[in-house]
Regions:
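Extracellular/periplasmic, surface-exposed regions of secreted and cell-surface proteins
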Residues: 1-193
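Flexible glycine-rich, low-complexity coil/linker segments exposed to the extracellular/periplasmic environment
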Residues: 54-70, 182-244
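Conserved C-terminal beta-signal and adjacent last beta-strands/turns
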Residues: 154, 245-246
Length: 246
């Protein structure tokens, strides 16, 4: 594959117009863009062979005969592509005692491998259908100083923020996977289930709630959110509950 990259940096503190200022001891602005390829993709995941039929698919006269049909699917898996843009700022101040590094990143994964279910089947077929966005920043603060001649110390703080979002699923709005879901506009592999909104406290409360009555719930049982308001807790009431990303 072809994976180009480019980067540039500007040490602003060395410019003539910065010579008279007293705040920055060092100031640098940098930016880069690059494309990466992920080849950790199992080619066999892009192949599926589905057999349908049963032992009595055909009838001839008074006899039944087995009949099966085999359908083969190919998705022709390719490498995932990752386009990443980084913008950073480095500066030192207070006679180089305070050093600050700030980085912003925008990482877009194209041709991400996802595995939707095949039509009329429980089998899945991996393909380059997805587009995933990761963006955020990293901040590092370091203070270096000394007390007297013999005691030196360093204090550091690191902060990070990451936002993950599914941008595209090959035309699908979501792909469910048991307790997780990939949904356009949400975080990758979000937790998916029923939201607990309380606990039934008394028999009277249970008797007045049609959901509790229908499911023989008693005080101490969880109360789940009825998302569509139909007084029935079923699969239509499952929702995104959060993400494994802190």
């Amino acid at each position: 594959g072809y994976f180009p990259s480019v980067g540039a940096a500007w040490v602003i503190s060395e410019e003539d117009f910065m010579k008279d200022q007293k705040f920055f001891d060092y100031l640098k602005l940098r930016a880069s863009w690059g494309r990466l390829g992920n080849d950790h993709v199992a080619a066999s995941d892009g192949f599926a062979s589905i057999t349908t039929g049963n032992s009595a698919s055909g009838v001839f006269g008074n006899s039944t005969f087995p009949g099966y049909q085999n359908t083969t699917y190919f998705s022709y898996l390719k490498w995932e592509l990752v386009d990443e843009t980084n913008v950073g700022l480095n500066f030192s101040t207070f006679k180089n005692r305070l050093n600050v590094d700030l980085d912003y990143f925008y990482r877009l994964t194209k041709r991400a491998v996802i595995s939707p279910r095949l039509p009329f089947s429980n089998d899945v077929l991996a393909g380059n259908y997805g587009k995933i966005l990761n963006s955020g920043f990293d901040l590092s603060l370091n203070w270096n100083d000394n007390i007297g001649r013999d005691f030196k110390y360093n204090l550091g703080v690191n902060l990070s923020y990451l936002k993950n979002k599914v941008k595209d699923l090959g035309g699908l709005s979501s792909i469910k996977g048991g307790k997780t879901i990939n949904m356009v506009g949400k975080e990758m592999n979000s937790y998916y289930g029923y939201k607990v909104v309380g606990v039934y406290q008394t028999l009277e409360e249970c008797a007045e709630d049609p959901i509790a009555v229908a499911n023989n719930l008693v005080p101490g049982d969880f109360k789940y959110e009825d998302v569509n308001g139909d007084n029935v807790i079923d699969g239509d009431d499952r929702q995104v509950l959060g993400s494994y990303i802190p």
